[in-house]
A protein has these predicted regions:
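Conserved beta-strand-loop surface patch within small alpha/beta domains used
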Residues: 1-80, 89-149
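Residue-level "edge-of-site" marker
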Residues: 86
């Protein structure tokens, strides 16, 4: 299971809709739980470095950008716990390309964007043997702010 608060879900949705008709992507920053669950505290949006004509169906994240996200998480005493990206005019289901480039411990949140609006958001977790993805439950919770500043 992956826990997303409303602010995180809104941020993923906004990024996916803003970059439509191109794919967007970013890192999920948060905590791993002892039971294998994950809590996403925030996202770290990344630039799609893919050449212009391929951005509609592929996202390319450069290693230097991943390292920057990992450093950001570490500085906040958090972990990179997954990755999110959009599928313009396609279902929120992992592609073979997604399977070929995934890691077993992370959550993979995919936003389906149809005609510029997010239609569905699903999360996926890869089998340890890397053979396939299984859908992962998303639990949403209200964003709680600290009233004391």
């Amino acid at each position: 299971m992956v826990i997303l608060n409303e602010k995180v879900l809104s941020s993923i949705t906004a990024h996916a809709e803003r970059d439509y008709p191109h794919e967007c992507g970013g890192m999920l920053i948060g905590h791993f739980a002892a039971d294998g669950g994950k809590t996403v505290a925030e996202i770290y949006p990344l630039e799609n470095a893919r050449e212009e004509e391929a951005r509609h169906n592929r996202v390319l994240i450069l290693p230097k950008d991943v390292m920057r996200a990992e450093r950001y998480a570490r500085d906040k005493k958090l972990d990179v716990i997954g990755y999110y990206h959009s599928h313009p005019d396609s279902p929120a289901v992992p592609s073979q390309y997604d399977l070929d480039h995934a890691l077993p411990v992370w959550s993979y949140v995919i936003a389906s964007v149809v005609k510029g609006k997010v239609a569905d958001v699903l999360s996926w977790k890869m089998e340890n043997d890397r053979s396939r993805f299984n859908e992962e439950n998303i639990q949403t919770e209200e964003f709680a702010t600290n009233a004391h500043g």
